[in-house]
Amino acid sequence: MSTILLNLDFGQPSKKAFGGNAKHQRFVKKRRFLEQKGFLNKKNQPPNKVSKLNSEPPKKGETSRVDGILKILPCPKKKEAAASKRDSERSKDKKAPLSWLTPAPSKKTASVVSKIDLLGEFQSALPKTKSTQKKGSKKKSLKKKIATENSTQAQSKDKGSKKKPLKKNAVPNSTQARSEDKCPTVPQNLPGKMVAIDCEMVGTGPKGRVSSLARCSIVNYNGDVLYDEYVLPPCYIVNYRTRWSGIRKCHMVNATPFKTARSQILKILSGKVVIGHAIHNDYKALQYFHPKSLTRDTSRIPLLNRKADCPENVTLSLKHLTKKLLSRDIQVGNTGHSSVEDAQATMELYKLVEVEWEQHLAQNPPEN
């Protein structure tokens, strides 16, 4: 069996245990002292209510905490008694200024530098003087001046912007007024972008029932020819339809292949307002569909039928409309039609109702 040894000490506890409490008490006293002087929690206190320093300054070796920074306040050895006398006199006089903050002269430069730092920190806790107020007033006056300058600039800009549209809305000259009366309300961009097209077809496929492109003509707004070519269909031609199309076998000798002609035609039509009579047949032969908003079909414009004294719901031929409205004969004889002549007649017919029809389309745009 092992024996158990107990070492017990029944003497009085050592004085070291109370050392920590004494330090803490000194720390609390110093903290209260600094709080009374207003050096702690400086941000929470108003600047005009700084507590007066009534107690003695810190002695040699003591520490003070200013703004959370622990600093040692060195004091000269020779003049401790004189400093204590001065402190007692200042405590009696409540209205005495904080003159003890000015450090006594010493030979060591390090102590002088530390005291100057403390003076700067202590003076920051004092209430603000009139000089700071003057600076603030100067800043306010500058802000007011800047605001007034900005307001005047904004007003001048507004006046300039108001003056400009007056020049645009000025009364036009007599020549301008006459030109506006003569010109219709149609957009001026349309005539340059308007073309009329007409195609002639031949019969391909079983018994020549399939209509294939054999000639295409395109004219501009003034009737000038932009494109007129014979086109060789990709399929064998069964029926030339010479009586209506005017196409003969000799025309196909040097004809342009369909793919090449189609690409050339579509380049001209892209972005243009295309006018035609029963134009859906021409698009079908080209294997192409143009946007409805850029298509004008003279066979489906009721205004032309009304001017020709015909019912609006009846589809009239190009030959009949040209005879009635333009007093001209087209598609005459056994030689067949001319696609150039038909395209020019289509453009002239559309010009008769251009203003009214474009206004109608502007109010009722077609859906693509």
Curated annotation (Swiss-Prot):
Q: Where is this region: Disordered?
A: 33-107, 127-187
Q: Which UniProt keywords apply?
A: Exonuclease, Hydrolase, Nuclease, Nucleus, Ribosome biogenesis
A GO CC annotation recorded here is: nucleolus
What residue spans carry the Basic and acidic residues bias annotation?
Answer: 77-96
Name the InterPro entries on file.
Exonuclease_RNaseT/DNA_pol3, ISG20_DEDDh, REXO1/3/4-like, RNaseH-like_sf, RNaseH_sf
Gene Ontology biological-process annotations: ribosome biogenesis
Q: What is its EC number?
A: 3.1.-.-
Which pairs of Cys residues are joined through disulfide bonds in the record? none
The protein's matches in Pfam families, at most eight in alphabetical order, are given as: RNase_T
Question: Which CDD domains does this UniProt record tie to the protein?
Answer: ISG20
Name the top EC class.
hydrolase
Q: Where is the composition biased (Polar residues)?
A: 42-54
- Give residue ranges for domain Exonuclease: 194-368
The role this protein plays is: 3'-> 5'-exoribonuclease involved in ribosome biogenesis in the processing of the 12S pre-rRNA. Displays a strong specificity for a 3'-end containing a free hydroxyl group.
Record's protein name = Interferon-stimulated 20 kDa exonuclease-like 2
